[in-house]
Amino acid sequence: MRLEEYWGIGPKTSALLSSELGVDRAVAAIESADTRELTKAGLSRGRATRILRRATGAEAMDLLATRDTRDVYKALLDLAEEHAVTEHAADRIRVLTPLPDRAAMEERLSSVLDARDAWASTDEATRDDVLAAFDRYDSVDGGELSAVRTALALQETGVDDGVFEPIATLESDRLDDAARALAGLRGDGDRVGDGADDQLDGLRDQLGQVEDLVATSPEVVEELQSEARRPDEFRDALTRYLTSETGVDAARVRDAAPQEAADARDFVESALRSLAGDLRSAVDEREATVAATLEEDLAAARETVDAAVEAVDDAALYVSLARFALAYDLTRPTFVADRETIAVRGARNLALQDAGDDVQPVTYAVGDHDLPAGREPPTGDRVAVLTGANSGGKTTLLETLCQVQLLAQMGLPVPADDAEVGLVDAIVFHRRHASFNAGVLESTLRSVVPPLTDAGRTLMLVDEFEAITEPGSAANLLHGLVTLTVERDALGVFVTHLADDLEPLPEAARTDGIFAEGLSPDLDLEVDYQPRFETVGKSTPEFIVSRLVANAADPVERTGFETLAQAVGEEAVQRTLSDARWSEGDSDD
């Protein structure tokens, strides 16, 4: 296969990968989603991630129909990545994509939840041991040696169920043999590494010391001349000196000494050069013997090594996702095939949870659902128009539904106590973008309408469409979008402040509302974020005006806010500010 057939790989990138990896290795790295291999070849991590997402999930990536949907997808991966136990696990999380069918989603879900349950039942000390083993694996770039050593360390922790079972079943003796072989063969270039063979290490040490003496031969001559005068004495003194200083066998030193020399310096230099050459040959010979033995040992353990790399990589990935699931109390969604729906009970927005905000769980649904009894949304309505208070969590609810749908179709657990999800082909999430520019309106319509008109199932999540055009036209366009969504048998939630202008809605659509309930003792707006079904929400501006009146320090400014209070309903404002002084005399002050 040509590299340029992959999305995002042009002539320049193809040439780089071909040069650094070769075509076959590059193709293998792309097909196996190996970010590490591509970044070592010179690609940036971000570029490698984009290429691999398309290579491994090109068709499923069409689910991300708008920029805002893609932003939610990336934010979810960022949250999951924070819980990665190795860099390679983080790389694999970054290239997770929506899956093409329900069977694949269920399979990944089961793996993640099995890992979650195993991790949750593991005591803290064992968790620390497991994380330390993964950290050790991460510290040497995730190579085969590191994977084998990590497998051995994980076996020592005693964890042997779930994602750790493939590691626990590996033969420890084979892993030990493989670790020694890999450690020996991981020297620079073709060099056998230090520690692989005691004899080889000894020869290398002797060679290094002799080479150091070659560089300081005049000092050696001077020292020997102080001890010996006659040639035979000088020869014996050199043998004793080199044996003492380098540990080289006396016979090898005598064999290296020249029979004739012009003077003492020539004799010492010739002997040292000859001895260094002899040791160099001995090192090469021993290294070749050791390398051959190590390669035989590694070949015998090859199957175990490959299994260890795969098992450790998979365990790292699923432990990372398990930690993500536990951190946010994620649960298994129920996939439904006989009806179209997205329905959640006790759903929570992950972005708010990550920020440390207090999150009110909400229950919501569109389509035909079968949520457990309780505050159950109406069933059968394919489209909902969501209205209500400013800062009432309407956009957050859209984002939460987007998170649930995306995570489910990625085969990951979702942030809800219960969730029913029908699979869709496109998620059209569109945030509020305030601009009356005609270009913005056109680009918005081009992004939200085609997924509806294309063949396939669509989830529409559209926020305050009126923000991009004047109210009259916005109401007409939004009514058209709602109608089109119903006619195309899609699902949708549309946030708007123009509910009254949208009547009458199509039969399969309803209106829901979020209500502001008052001000707290600290004059913070209190909102019930749980939508009330089949009713128009109220933004209750008197609460906002009440807060402005109470907080106004300047008398003139307060008078202005009191005028606004009369406009929105002075009685309501007085009721809200029951603890605040409200009289003409106060405002005159």
Explain the meaning of each model-derived region.
Residues 247-320:
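Extended, charged coiled-coil "arm/hinge" scaffolds of SMC/Rad50-like chromosome-maintenance ATPases
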Residues 201-215, 232, 277, 306, ...:
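Generic structural signal for well-ordered, non-transmembrane alpha-helical segments
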Residues 158-159, 231, 235, 253-254, ...:
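Short, ordered beta-strand-loop transition motifs
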Residues 1-223:
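Conserved amphipathic alpha-helical "coupling/scaffold" segments
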Residues 211, 218-232, 239, 280, ...:
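Coiled-coil heptad-register positions
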